[in-house]
Amino acid sequence: MSDFDDSLLDDQEALTRVDAPLRALAGTGARIRMDAAELVRPDLGPGYRPRGVVIVGPESRLVRALLEPCCPVPVVAWPFAGLPAWTGPLDLVVVLAGSVGAGPDEVSSSAEAVRRGAAVIVAAPADSQVARAADSSSTVRIRTRSEDALGSAVAAVSILHELGLCPPVRPGDVAERADMVAEESSPFHDLSDNPAKDLALALADAMPLAWGDSVLAARAARRVAEALRRASGRPALAAVSAELLPVIEGAPAHDPFADPDDGPARLRPVLVIFDDGERSPAGDEQRDRLVAAAELHDVRVCAVLADDGGALDRYVTLRQKGLYGAAYLELGLSGRRT
């Protein structure tokens, strides 16, 4: 018997159970605009070009993924306290933090960057500990006001574009993508006209296998898999195709004569492809292998699509669509705990 009650997805009283996460998701665009409201043109000297870029804090790997394909200098996402031993006055350190400031690692990295004489871009509230630690004559300050690490990352990337380190990123456009997903995923749209609710229904009795067809799509897949695990308390795997194929190939055969009311539902894998429109021969080959294996082993395939806008626009679209799906999955499963 399925634990998922799809009638809850269109029940206005039941929807109050996930009011907090839905409101948080709906406010993503507003938070991005808020954190980008006070952006200033960086003044690090004419023709400034760092030897390398070190990124620390939440969403550092997202910023690295955006920079790596086109940045003319090496880029490192540093997950520890302090900084790499080679960091010095010729380098740029980017520190990301939310409105609650940052953890001790980010504060340590900020202070170390100043001590070594590196240029610093810090995205943090003006009165936070990390902003104070990063204070120097060569610090570019982005005064953020929300708790959303994504907003800090978007603001920082727009500054990095001004320095010629990445393609154009317009925070307003990114925010608009988040707003568009919020509109189409609104709880006031019923299941027949709501892709996020439809995704939740597809994953009702499933073990999601999330795969992205590009670096950023794969990152969105990992973020969504994390949310699905929290929402359902079930396994959800985001991995490269070589790691997903054995799971698909080992899926138990589907029994069309099984009684759905006879015992608990058996979780079967569902392949969820996050497609941001980036195409490469290697990515196309991996996709074809995954889909072929899924068809052979009677594994359902779902697609989350974003094929319009810049790289960060598409990433945010994929991420938001998946996170809305996770929220509705949590709602559909909430009956088992009531």
Model-derived features with residue positions:
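A generic structural motif
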Residues: 75-82, 123-125, 144, 234-246, ...
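Glycine-rich, anion-gripping cofactor-binding loops and their flanking helix/strand elements
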Residues: 85, 93-108, 248-281
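Active-site phosphate/pyrophosphate-binding segments
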Residues: 12, 17-20, 24, 30-45, ...
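Glycine-rich phosphate-binding loops that contact phosphosugars or nucleotide phosphates
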Residues: 47-182
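Short, charged N-terminal beta->alpha structural module
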Residues: 18-22, 50-71, 216-229, 284-289
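Phosphate-moiety recognition in structured ligand-binding domains
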Residues: 1-40, 68, 118-126, 130-138, ...
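Structural motif
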Residues: 55-59, 96-99, 123-125, 211-215, ...
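Short helix-loop-beta junction
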Residues: 64-76, 226-237, 293-298
